[in-house]
Amino acid sequence: VAVVPYEVRTELTGPRKLAAVRAVTTPQRLSTDIIRLLDQVWPLLREQGARTGHNVVIYRPGEGGELVIDAGVEVPEGFTARGEVRPVDTPAGEVATTTHYGDYSELSAAYAALERWCATSSRPLSGTSWEVYGDWDDDPARRRTDVYLLL
C-alpha cells in the first residue's frame, strides 16, 4: 500500500449550517457515539424533507480527556429543531486543513500531519477541529474525509 503524503493548506472558512446533537464522549466511545447521534438527526431531517449535505462532526476538548462533540448533517437551507437536534454552525475563521482518503480508523495520520505542519509553521491550535465526511464508498480507500483544525 502506497503512503500518500498529506497536503496541508490554510483557508478562511465560513460557517456551515448543521442539524446536530451534542454529547460528551471519550476516544473509546467515539465511533459508537457518532453513529448514535447521527441516528437521531437523520430521521428528523427525512421527516421534514430537508435538503441535506454531508455528515460533519465538530470536536472540542472536554474535561479529563473527554471530548465534546456535535455530530450532525449539513442543512444549507435550515430545518426545524426538535428535541436534542438543534442548529449548530461549524466554526468560522482560519484553519489548517487536509484531505484523508481511507478508513476512518486511520484518520489519526491526517491529524498528525496537520499538527506537524502547525508546529513547524509556529501556528498555535485552538483545540477545535471538525471532519466533513464524503459520500460513503464500500471501498475504504475511496472514502474521503476533510479534516479542519481551527487556528
Question: Where in this protein do the model-derived segments appear?
Answer:
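A solvent-exposed interaction/effector surface
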Residues: V1-L151
